[in-house]
Swiss-Prot record:
GO terms for molecular function: phosphatidylserine decarboxylase activity. Its main location: membrane. The record marks 189-190 as: Cleavage (non-hydrolytic). Its cofactor is pyruvate. The gene is psd. This is Phosphatidylserine decarboxylase proenzyme. Pathway: Phospholipid metabolism; phosphatidylethanolamine biosynthesis; phosphatidylethanolamine from CDP-diacylglycerol: step 2/2. It catalyses: a 1,2-diacyl-sn-glycero-3-phospho-L-serine + H(+) = a 1,2-diacyl-sn-glycero-3-phosphoethanolamine + CO2.
Length: 232
């Protein structure tokens, strides 16, 4: 393998949603260079950051039935029992909820935590308070999705944050998702909540780093065989 190919192999692809933003940053950088070179270099750093924000690296997802993987890169901010939002239609009993906070430095492409059918997608307008606060799950702009699996229904909620102002969904109701398949993106910092079926036991802890499509959040078949993987 040549040096150029080796370098290219280490650079993750950029998601198409980022092209307009990267282009705008690059154009602004050119203007800044014309005004004053030091400003141009600051613009260059910001353009590189923007490109990294929209990176979309390949992930190797465990695909054995019963596994729930992280839908987002970031830090596990909460592992709690919580009544799901009424919009999800998952009942009024507390369910295990895993929350993952994404900083502006994380990859923001979101991936399906399970294999299943998208039953409902509900968009809710709202505020843009700090996504790390628990009340953000009720007050902030969010996009909720319910996925049906053999083990029960999984609720996935994309929550906009203090900086994030745009939730993007790539899927539609009735669509079948593979585990780790891309389903959306949130621009510039946010949170993902995953509501597990009653009785499920989360396998992650608060403060743990999660990798979208790879980190296992729960396993409905603990002790049953090994895991197989898919790369995408």
């Amino acid at each position: 393998m040549s040096v150029v190919k080796s370098i290219r192999a280490q650079i993750p692809p950029i998601h198409r949603e980022g092209y307009p933003f990267i282009g705008a940053f690059a154009l602004a950088t050119l203007v800044l260079f014309l005004i004053w070179a030091p400003l141009g270099w600051i613009g260059t750093v910001l353009t590189i950051w923007c490109a990294l924000f929209f990176r979309d690296p390949v992930r190797v997802t465990p695909v054995r039935e019963g596994l729930v993987v992280a839908p987002a890169d970031g830090r596990v901010s909460m592992v709690v029992q919580m009544i799901p939002p009424p919009a999800l239609g998952l009942g009024d009993k507390p369910l295990p909820r895993v929350s993952i906070f994404m900083s502006v430095f994380n990859c923001h492409v979101n991936r399906s935590p399970v294999a299943g059918r998208v039953e409902r997608i509900i968009y809710s307008p709202g505020k843009f308070i700090n996504a790390e606060l628990d009340k953000a799950s009720e007050d902030n702009e969010r996009n909720s999705m319910v996925i049906s699996t053999p083990a029960g229904q999984i609720g996935v909620v994309q929550i906009a944050g203090l900086v994030a102002r745009r939730i993007v969904s790539f899927v539609r109701e009735g669509q079948t998702l593979a585990p780790g398949e891309r389903f959306g993106l949130i621009r510039f910092g946010s949170r993902l909540d995953v509501y597990l079926p009653e009785g499920a036991k989360p396998l992650v802890s608060e403060g743990q780093t999660a990798i979208a499509g790879e980190t296992v959040l729960a396993d409905f078949n603990l002790g049953d065989g090994g895991r197989t993987y898919r790369a995408d």
